[in-house]
């Protein structure tokens, strides 16, 4: 039993309650109010010293296993030129003399002195170890000659593979990532998952939606996350990235979709997000749609009939329209009162699309970090989109239309950081689209839990829900919105226990936690 007093507790519930006392028993909240009930008067009290306490944060779109994998290798986002990038890569190689390949992450033309992306020749000058660097946006990658020599013929023959530069786009990219991630040992992945979960907890994240399924043989990555998630400190909701509904049903999973095979278009960084009007710098280019409308409709109809919750990637307005049309077709074919299907990204949504999404009950899973992204700066977006750049992520319009809006990172594309995300939501580059601090906080707490039918246990500081919360040094609802990002985390509690980064579980302890939580399930 813990009796927490003298705190500024922000419930994030629908009534926006605040209070000064919260009592927890094991992993559940059992009381909230402004005075300690007589029943608990004899219990030891913990003085919160006026600090602010909010529900544990959520991240409603990430690729957790990819984030975990790249956390074990090299992130080159901070490299200021190719020489520095080479040093980072070779430092890792020197520290891992038995490595047979290196998957790295984060290159961008906008953050290096060369002002271009590295090509095969640049990578060959760095190492002859098979090397793949995934671009910062997670939608393209470049390989060195040593890796290209290992690629199977279907990658080399794919139209998305550029043999001259070594770059892989669209389907070639997905095949290339599948090829290299399929060679990662389960132990490496498991260790990476533990470290990744710890990094997320340090940021106050206790509730996660992850999209998984990137080509491991027999979908072992799906089975791995479905087991290991039970031993990690957060709550994980797993979406299977497949269009094969039977695979999901056989595993008794209830969520399908994501990116990869469910990416309806590309991204702005590769200028292949699907647009209704051409790119400003290349008017003849409207990006690409990965599927026909009929193909997407048929998938959504099958998944919706199976009672699954669907999520799909759509960045450009043409892809957004395709996704909404498919959801409409599925719900017309088999009406479900509360399906809560999800559209990931929704970067370019006009008011008609927003209204249609609201009528269909679609959740929009946005990534606020895209609005302040060094690897994809505003000047670049303006150069390719013109005036449309000011309409990226119209958060105000979405919330005003009654849409359920949830926030995430798309990790490893951006580094998960909910406080930074709340700051960006409140300081939108287009001030007309900014959210209030209360709304921004709910995109990281209550609304994510509600979007996946978990608001009975997560998302607010309410009796009966999980005792997962974050202690902050500032009241982010009352400080100037320009100062929100200066807020520091003073403590993280997950399921009633204080999280301490030094308390990494041993393999036997992890196994015991998995077994215990299997029994609870």
Report the location of each language-model feature.
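An anion/phosphate-binding loop that grips the pyrophosphate of nucleotide cofactors and donors
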Residues: 60, 360, 467
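Flexible loop/turn segments at secondary-structure boundaries
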Residues: 110-112, 140-141, 208-209, 215-220, ...
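Active-site microenvironment of metallo-dependent hydrolases
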Residues: 1-26, 30-38, 86-95, 186-202, ...
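Divalent metal-binding segments
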Residues: 2-5, 10-25, 29-234, 238-243, ...
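His/Asp/Glu-enriched, well-ordered alpha-helical/loop segment
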Residues: 301-309, 318-320, 324-341, 346, ...
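Short, glycine-/Ser/Thr-/acidic-enriched flexible segments
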Residues: 28-29, 36, 51, 109, ...
């Amino acid at each position: 039993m813990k009796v927490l007093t003298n705190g500024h507790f922000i419930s994030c519930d629908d009534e926006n309650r605040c209070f000064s006392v919260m009592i927890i028993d094991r992993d559940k909240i059992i009381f909230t109010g402004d005075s300690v009930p007589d029943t608990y008067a004899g219990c030891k009290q913990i003085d919160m010293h006026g600090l602010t306490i909010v529900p544990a944060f959520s991240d409603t779109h990430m690729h957790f296993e990819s984030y975990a994998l790249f956390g074990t290798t090299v992130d080159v986002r901070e490299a200021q030129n190719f020489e520095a990038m080479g040093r980072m890569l070779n430092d890792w190689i020197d520290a891992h003399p038995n490595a047979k390949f290196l998957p790295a992450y984060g290159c961008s033309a906008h953050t290096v002195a060369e002002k271009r992306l590295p090509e095969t020749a640049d990578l060959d000058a760095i190492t002859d170890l098979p090397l793949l660097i995934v671009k910062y946006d997670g939608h393209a990658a470049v390989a060195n000659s040593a890796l290209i020599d290992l690629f199977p013929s279907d990658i080399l023959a794919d139209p998305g593979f550029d043999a001259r530069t070594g770059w892989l786009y669209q389907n070639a990219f997905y095949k290339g990532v599948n090829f290299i991630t399929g060679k990662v040992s389960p132990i490496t992945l498991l260790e990476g998952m533990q470290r990744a979960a710890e990094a997320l907890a340090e940021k106050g994240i206790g509730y996660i939606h992850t999209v998984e399924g990137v080509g491991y043989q027999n979908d072992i990555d799906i089975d791995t996350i479905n087991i290991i998630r039970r031993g990690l400190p957060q709550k994980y909701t797993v979406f299977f990235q497949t269009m094969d509904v039977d695979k999901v049903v056989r595993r008794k999973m209830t969520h399908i979709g994501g990116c990869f095979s469910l990416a309806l278009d590309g991204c702005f960084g590769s200028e292949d997000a699907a647009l209704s009007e051409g790119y400003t710098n290349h008017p003849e280019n409207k990006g690409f749609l990965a599927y026909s409308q009929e193909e997407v409709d048929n998938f959504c109809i099958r998944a919706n009939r199976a009672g699954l919750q669907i999520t799909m990637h759509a960045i450009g307005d043409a892809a957004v329209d395709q996704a909404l049309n498919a959801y409409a077709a599925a719900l017309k074919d088999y009406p479900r009162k509360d399906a809560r299907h999800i559209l990931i990204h929704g970067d370019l949504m006009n008011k008609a699309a927003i209204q249609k999404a609201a009528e269909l009950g679609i959740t929009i899973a946005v990534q606020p970090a895209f609005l302040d992204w060094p690897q994809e700066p505003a000047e670049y977006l303006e150069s390719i989109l013109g005036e449309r750049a000011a309409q990226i992520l119209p958060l105000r319009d979405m919330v005003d239309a009654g849409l359920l809006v949830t926030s995430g990172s798309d990790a490893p594309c951006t580094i998960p950081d909910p406080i930074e995300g709340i700051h960006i939501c409140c300081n939108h580059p287009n001030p007309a689209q900014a959210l209030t601090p209360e709304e921004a906080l709910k995109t990281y707490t209550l609304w994510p839990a509600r979007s996946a039918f978990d608001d009975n246990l997560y998302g607010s500081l309410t009796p009966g829900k999980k005792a997962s919360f974050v202690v902050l040094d500032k009241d982010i609802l009352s400080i100037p919105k320009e100062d929100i990002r200066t807020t520091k985390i003073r403590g993280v509690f997950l399921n009633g226990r204080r999280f301490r980064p030094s308390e990494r579980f041993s393999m036997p302890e992890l196994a015991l936690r998995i077994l215990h939580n299997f029994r609870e399930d």
